[in-house]
Amino acid sequence: MSLRPNAKTEVRRNRYKVAVDAEEGRRRREDNMVEIRKSKREESLQKKRREGLQANQLPQFAPSPVPASSTVEKKLESLPAMVGGVWSDDRSLQLEATTQFRKLLSIERSPPIEEVIDAGVVPRFVEFLTREDYPQLQFEAAWALTNIASGTSENTKVVIEHGAVPIFVQLLASQSDDVREQAVWALGNVAGDSPRCRDLVLGQGALIPLLSQLNEHAKLSMLRNATWTLSNFCRGKPQPPFDQVRPALPALERLIHSTDEEVLTDACWALSYLSDGTNDKIQSVIEAGVVPRLVELLQHQSPSVLIPALRSIGNIVTGDDLQTQCVISHGALLSLLSLLTHNHKKSIKKEACWTISNITAGNRDQIQAVCEAGLICPLVNLLQNAEFDIKKEAAWAISNATSGGSPDQIKYMVEQGVVKPLCDLLVCPDPRIITVCLEGLENILKVGEAEKVTGNTGDVNFYAQLIDDAEGLEKIENLQSHDNSEIYEKAVKILETYWLEEEDETLPPGDPSAQGFQFGGGNDAAVPPGGFNFQ
């Protein structure tokens, strides 16, 4: 299944806010933000073509394995005879010809889907789906149609337009295990084609009979296929109407306790789609009781499971403080620490940092929990040394923590070394991240100023000195000429507030050079040509 078939247009909350409250600081995911799935995996999940099985894997009705692709051309030569068999009134010829078509459509590479469609047999296969008296023929026809629907959108459209979808939904109640399983697979392929096709399948009432396949008596192959199809029912943008997919939540809560990696993977992806949205959707996911197990799965050895579990947790903490607290209370912070500090791939670390950034956008108790879990030090390490995509997310995590944190929490973060890497990112190419880092530094400077006012630091803003020592002052000065007006204005404001007064105090009384700089908050303030320079 493709995670990004349609461009998400959601903008990060709190793009350039000066003061960040918990709601503003949380950020929904952007489409291009976390590239965590290989295209091969995306494609195989969106649609699956049923290929030939070994003799010991064949379902009850599959009489023989698939021919080698080298015989395809020879098979196509006999296409007229196969078509004749399909349209015959002879039951055995119908089955034999349909089976030949199924084999042809099941070859490993480039099956001749277009040629089969052009042969005009699709309506006949759909008709065969209704043959309750002949489940073996139903099965072969369903398999052939499944593989046609695994092709292009145009191929899928042909299957839909010949009326197969409502019949496949009816076949979910078939007496035959194999027919039911093939119907599940076919519906997964149709739903996986596009949100429009997904909604068509849901509109035919497919969800409830699909969920009934997920029982304790189901074979593993059925569990895998039904869970995969369920994930396709939940996938895609625009999202399906939540009321249509909400009934899947109790089943997903059971499925994430499976020991099978494929079932776990697709169940977690389904939860990641359902939790990607408004707080009421997030609340429904929480109330389904999935959070404890999702947190456990953050330590799963397989990235295929870990990634969608992390995505789900990350989505949940975009909710309100209570929803975020549910994740914290179930021990997610220690798992996130492990993801930051162990040798996980870039995409996982990036996703973990994004998740933490939404936790640090919470209240002070939640920021304290992040500090006590030991997350600040590894965040600083990533902020300093990781690839830029990870640095960006770590910068959000630190900046959000400074926005909502107490003075003591900010002092702790400074002690952990946040100042230098924040300063270093002021020269990065991303204006949003420059702004995020400026906000973080400004929040730190405010605490330093408060300490200075109380006389605790000998009339010196110790944090301003730290920023200067980290070459941050020079970088802030240079931002006065930045193309982005918000960055320029913020840089000027920081320089006015935390360095100009210091410069003024060093000038001798009556020094004429002080006359043009009336910046004490008056409206007549003017920035000197070229900006401030305090070096």
Curated annotation (Swiss-Prot):
ARM repeats lie at residues 67-106, 110-150, 153-192, 195-235, 237-276, 279-318, 321-361, 364-403, 407-446, 461-500. One of its GO terms (biological process) is response to salt stress. It is found in: Nucleus envelope. Residues 1-58 form the IBB domain. GO terms for molecular function: nuclear import signal receptor activity; nuclear localization sequence binding. SUPFAM superfamilies: ARM repeat. One of its GO terms (cellular component) is nuclear envelope. Residues 20-67 are annotated as: Disordered. Residues 20-46 have a biased composition (Basic and acidic residues). Keywords: Nucleus, Protein transport, Repeat, Transport. InterPro entries: ARM-like (IPR011989), ARM-type_fold (IPR016024), Arm_3 (IPR032413), Armadillo (IPR000225), Importin-a_IBB (IPR002652), Importin-a_IBB_sf (IPR036975), Importin_alpha (IPR024931). Belongs to the importin alpha family. Forms a complex with the importin subunit beta-1 KPNB1. Interacts with A.tumefaciens VirD2 and VirE2. Binds to SWO1. Binds to conventional NLS motifs and mediates nuclear protein import across the nuclear envelope. Involved in the maintenance of cell wall integrity under salt stress via interaction with SWO1. Acts as a cellular receptor for the nuclear import of the virD2 protein of Agrobacterium, but is not essential for Agrobacterium-mediated root transformation. This is Importin subunit alpha-2. It comes from Arabidopsis thaliana.
